[in-house]
Amino acid sequence: MAKQIQAIRGMNDILPTQSPLWQKVEAVLRASVAAYGYSEIRTPIVENTDLFKRSIGEVTDIVEKEMYTFEDRNGDSLTLRPEGTASTVRAGNEHGLLYNQEQRLWYMGPMFRHERPQKGRYRQFHQFGVEVYGIGSADIDAEVLMLSARLWEKLGISEHVTLELNTLGDPAERAAYREALIAFLEQHKDKLDEDSQRRMYSNPLRVLDSKDPQVQSILADAPALMDYLGEESSQHFAQLRELLDAVGIQYRVNPRLVRGLDYYNRTVFEWVTNSLGSQGTVLAGGRYDGLVAQLGGKDTPAVGFAMGLERIVLLLETLELTQDIPAAVDVYVAAMGDSCLVEAIKVAQELRSTLPTLRVMSHCGGGNFKKQIKRADKSGAQVALLIGEEELAEGVVTVKYLRNDNEQQRVARNALSAFLAELTK
C-alpha cells in the first residue's frame, strides 16, 4: 500500500463539517465592509522578498525567523506573503491607485509564517484586512474602529472583546522617545532577556512588547511615549478618543502597545479577548503614513487593520456560538425506483431554478428506501422529497420531515415550490 501524504505541519485542511462556520464568518466580514463602502483588492500570494524587508522591517521576528523565502529559477528571492498590507501598498503604487486619491479597500486570503504551530496560530492562516489611503485625519481612524466593532456585533461576540488603544506619535517624536528609552534600558541591560538586549538598539520600542515578566517589571518605570508627543499628535489622539466616546465604543489606553511591525505611527490598536489564553489578540492595526513612500510611492496617509480568521473561528467555538450554523442542504430528493429517477432529477432542477437560494441535493447511486432515507438524514436536510411510481402517477411528491415528528404529506407537483418556500423561509 502506498504511503499516505500528510498536510504540512501547521497548514490545515478546512473540512466540510467546518466550512459552514467559516462561510458564516466570511459572510459577516463581506457584508460589514460593504456597509461602509469598501472595495475588495486581491494580490498575489508570492511577492519579491524586498517588499517585506522594506515594509515590515529587517529587525523583526517575521523577517528574521518566520518568512517562507526561496529563490526561483532566475535567482530572484521570493517570499510567500506573511501579511497583507505591504502587498496592498505595492499594488496601489504599481497601478496608480493611491496618489492624490482616497481608497477604502479590503482583502481576505491565506498568509504564511514559519512559527511554532499552536491553537489559533498556524503556518498557513487566513487574514482579513481593511486599508484606507489618502485620509490623514482622526475621523477615518475612528471609522475603521467602528467597522471593527460592527464585526463583533454581527458575530455576537462584542461582550468578549476589549479595545486597547495607543499612539506612537510621528517619526520625530518617536526618535526623541527612542533615545530616552535606550538610555533607560542601558541602565538595566544586565536584567534584560536575550531578545530585549538584541532589540535595545535596533528596535527598542519592541522591548515594550516583551512578554518576559522581569522585563515588564523593569518597564514599569520606563519613560512614557505620551510625554514626547507634540501638539498635533496629541490633538489627533484626543479627537480619536472623543469620536469613539461619541459613538459608545469603549476602550482602554495601553501605553505599552506598540505593535510588531515597524511601519506604524500615531494610532495603534488591538482588540483582545480573555477567552483564548495566550492567543488573546483577535484584531490589530493602526496608522502607517510613511509606508506608501517607503515602498516607492508619494507621501500618502494610511490606516487599517487585520485579523486572523482561524482565531475568530476558534473564539466562536470556544464560546459555543456555532449552534445557529445551518446545514449545507435544505431538501433531499430521492427516487423510489429506477423508473422514477428522471422525474426526481427534473424536480430537483426545477426547484433550483424557481428557488435559487434553496439548497437541493439529489440522491445518486441507487439503493433501497432505507439507504436513501439514511443518506437524506445524514445530509442535514429539513425534508426529503420522495418520488415513487405512485407519486409519479398522481402528479404529487411525498414530503418526509427529517427534523421533527410531523407526519409526512403529499404535495402537488405544481404547488411544490410555493410549499417549500414557505417551509424553509
Curated annotation (Swiss-Prot):
<keyword id="KW-0436">Ligase</keyword>
<dbReference type="InterPro" id="IPR004516">
    <property type="entry name" value="HisRS/HisZ"/>
</dbReference>
<dbReference type="InterPro" id="IPR033656">
    <property type="entry name" value="HisRS_anticodon"/>
</dbReference>
<dbReference type="GO" id="GO:0005737">
    <property type="term" value="C:cytoplasm"/>
</dbReference>
<keyword id="KW-0963">Cytoplasm</keyword>
<dbReference type="InterPro" id="IPR015807">
    <property type="entry name" value="His-tRNA-ligase"/>
</dbReference>
<dbReference type="GO" id="GO:0005524">
    <property type="term" value="F:ATP binding"/>
</dbReference>
<keyword id="KW-0547">Nucleotide-binding</keyword>
<dbReference type="Pfam" id="PF03129">
    <property type="entry name" value="HGTP_anticodon"/>
</dbReference>
<dbReference type="InterPro" id="IPR045864">
    <property type="entry name" value="aa-tRNA-synth_II/BPL/LPL"/>
</dbReference>
<comment type="similarity">
    <text>Belongs to the class-II aminoacyl-tRNA synthetase family.</text>
</comment>
<dbReference type="GO" id="GO:0006427">
    <property type="term" value="P:histidyl-tRNA aminoacylation"/>
</dbReference>
<dbReference type="Pfam" id="PF13393">
    <property type="entry name" value="tRNA-synt_His"/>
</dbReference>
<dbReference type="GO" id="GO:0004821">
    <property type="term" value="F:histidine-tRNA ligase activity"/>
</dbReference>
<keyword id="KW-0648">Protein biosynthesis</keyword>
<comment type="subunit">
    <text>Homodimer.</text>
</comment>
<dbReference type="InterPro" id="IPR036621">
    <property type="entry name" value="Anticodon-bd_dom_sf"/>
</dbReference>
<dbReference type="InterPro" id="IPR006195">
    <property type="entry name" value="aa-tRNA-synth_II"/>
</dbReference>
<dbReference type="InterPro" id="IPR041715">
    <property type="entry name" value="HisRS-like_core"/>
</dbReference>
<keyword id="KW-0067">ATP-binding</keyword>
<dbReference type="InterPro" id="IPR004154">
    <property type="entry name" value="Anticodon-bd"/>
</dbReference>
<keyword id="KW-0030">Aminoacyl-tRNA synthetase</keyword>
<protein>
    <recommendedName>
        <fullName>Histidine--tRNA ligase</fullName>
        <ecNumber>6.1.1.21</ecNumber>
    </recommendedName>
</protein>
